[in-house]
Every structure is written in C-alpha cells, then in structure tokens.
C-alpha cells in the first residue's frame, strides 16, 4: 500500500478548471500518478446519484487501464456497487466502524486523521489500511478544512510509533512535497497541484522525484 500512496491524486468534477475530469485523470495517469480518489463534493459537484455513478465508472475504467487503484470518497454504497479498490472516509463522514463492517476484506479502507490520538485510534481498529493526515498546508480545495497542522503532525504521529501507511494532504505541491515526505509521510495527495497545472507531467514527475528538474 505504501508505494501506491506515492502520488495520490484526488478530484471530482468540481475541481476541474480546464477540460473534463476523465481527460485530466487520463493525463495524470499517463504522467505516473499511483492512486486516484474520486471525491465528488461541494459547490459545482455532480448532484444526482446516477451522474456520480456514471462518472465513477468512467474514472474506474481509466484507472484499470493504467493499473492504478481507484478509491471512492465517502460513498460506501457506490464503492461496493461498482467494486472500487478502496473507500476513504473522514472523521465526520460515515462512521468508520460501519465502513469496516461493510468493506473490510473487499477493498482498502482509508481514514482521514488530524491528531496523534485519531491516528492511534485508526491503528487500534485494525482494519484501516492507511491514514490521510492534514491539512499540512493551507488549501483552496476544501472549504470545510480543519486547521492547518504543518509537517509537525507527521513527525508526531511517527514518534508515537504509528506504523500505518501515511499520505499527507492539504496544500501540497511540487515545491513543498519533499518536506512532507521527510517528516514521515509515505506519499502525498494533491488536487489543485494537478487540476490547475498547465503541465501535469512535470508536476507529477517532481512529486514522485522531489529532485526532478522543473
């Protein structure tokens, strides 16, 4: 799982400023993302279940073509219906124990955490496959984001002995990703660093190899 978290792209239709979500996703897949999470939330997102399912299936097919895990954010029913590779939930989304009961053994389970205690609880549950930690830096992609924690939270979680794979989230881009990895994350998750880029190939190469020339 750790290798799959290296460059973890998150997006929904609400994040796309040029082109379409499938178009942006395929470019990102060609450039080398290692995981994709379909997150359809907030202003500008698809509103009906049928629209979300249709988009999820199109994105899932693209991920399968490039052999990259396809994860759905906070929609267990849809993830189970289409056979997603994983489900990701936040602290205020579907109750994690219910998610585990429905999904354990069928797909990977990811959980967002914002503190050492939440990370410790995720590890105690025994069925969480990885944790998303943040927001590390200020973000424009999530209106209801938690307070910024900085990279220190990653160091604190690792010092506490948490062994779960960690992906950092929140305001991460090709200029600061090295800090996130140095602090203890196994990978970085990005939204706008890819969706708002004119050259996602270069961005993704730099995210995968922080020393890669820009």
UniProtKB/Swiss-Prot annotation:
<protein>
    <recommendedName>
        <fullName>Thiamine-phosphate synthase</fullName>
        <ecNumber>2.5.1.3</ecNumber>
    </recommendedName>
</protein>
<dbReference type="GO" id="GO:0004789">
    <property type="term" value="F:thiamine-phosphate diphosphorylase activity"/>
</dbReference>
<dbReference type="InterPro" id="IPR013785">
    <property type="entry name" value="Aldolase_TIM"/>
</dbReference>
<dbReference type="GO" id="GO:0009229">
    <property type="term" value="P:thiamine diphosphate biosynthetic process"/>
</dbReference>
<keyword id="KW-0479">Metal-binding</keyword>
<feature type="binding site">
    <location>
        <position position="112"/>
    </location>
    <ligand>
        <name>4-amino-2-methyl-5-(diphosphooxymethyl)pyrimidine</name>
    </ligand>
</feature>
<keyword id="KW-0808">Transferase</keyword>
<feature type="binding site">
    <location>
        <begin position="37"/>
        <end position="41"/>
    </location>
    <ligand>
        <name>4-amino-2-methyl-5-(diphosphooxymethyl)pyrimidine</name>
    </ligand>
</feature>
<feature type="binding site">
    <location>
        <position position="73"/>
    </location>
    <ligand>
        <name>4-amino-2-methyl-5-(diphosphooxymethyl)pyrimidine</name>
    </ligand>
</feature>
<comment type="pathway">
    <text>Cofactor biosynthesis; thiamine diphosphate biosynthesis; thiamine phosphate from 4-amino-2-methyl-5-diphosphomethylpyrimidine and 4-methyl-5-(2-phosphoethyl)-thiazole: step 1/1.</text>
</comment>
<keyword id="KW-0460">Magnesium</keyword>
<feature type="binding site">
    <location>
        <position position="93"/>
    </location>
    <ligand>
        <name>Mg(2+)</name>
    </ligand>
</feature>
<dbReference type="InterPro" id="IPR022998">
    <property type="entry name" value="ThiamineP_synth_TenI"/>
</dbReference>
<feature type="binding site">
    <location>
        <begin position="191"/>
        <end position="192"/>
    </location>
    <ligand>
        <name>2-[(2R,5Z)-2-carboxy-4-methylthiazol-5(2H)-ylidene]ethyl phosphate</name>
    </ligand>
</feature>
<feature type="binding site">
    <location>
        <position position="142"/>
    </location>
    <ligand>
        <name>4-amino-2-methyl-5-(diphosphooxymethyl)pyrimidine</name>
    </ligand>
</feature>
<dbReference type="InterPro" id="IPR034291">
    <property type="entry name" value="TMP_synthase"/>
</dbReference>
<dbReference type="Pfam" id="PF02581">
    <property type="entry name" value="TMP-TENI"/>
</dbReference>
<comment type="function">
    <text>Condenses 4-methyl-5-(beta-hydroxyethyl)thiazole monophosphate (THZ-P) and 2-methyl-4-amino-5-hydroxymethyl pyrimidine pyrophosphate (HMP-PP) to form thiamine monophosphate (TMP).</text>
</comment>
<feature type="binding site">
    <location>
        <position position="171"/>
    </location>
    <ligand>
        <name>2-[(2R,5Z)-2-carboxy-4-methylthiazol-5(2H)-ylidene]ethyl phosphate</name>
    </ligand>
</feature>
<comment type="similarity">
    <text>Belongs to the thiamine-phosphate synthase family.</text>
</comment>
<dbReference type="GO" id="GO:0000287">
    <property type="term" value="F:magnesium ion binding"/>
</dbReference>
<keyword id="KW-0784">Thiamine biosynthesis</keyword>
<feature type="binding site">
    <location>
        <position position="74"/>
    </location>
    <ligand>
        <name>Mg(2+)</name>
    </ligand>
</feature>
<feature type="binding site">
    <location>
        <begin position="139"/>
        <end position="141"/>
    </location>
    <ligand>
        <name>2-[(2R,5Z)-2-carboxy-4-methylthiazol-5(2H)-ylidene]ethyl phosphate</name>
    </ligand>
</feature>
<dbReference type="GO" id="GO:0009228">
    <property type="term" value="P:thiamine biosynthetic process"/>
</dbReference>
<dbReference type="GO" id="GO:0005737">
    <property type="term" value="C:cytoplasm"/>
</dbReference>
<dbReference type="InterPro" id="IPR036206">
    <property type="entry name" value="ThiamineP_synth_sf"/>
</dbReference>
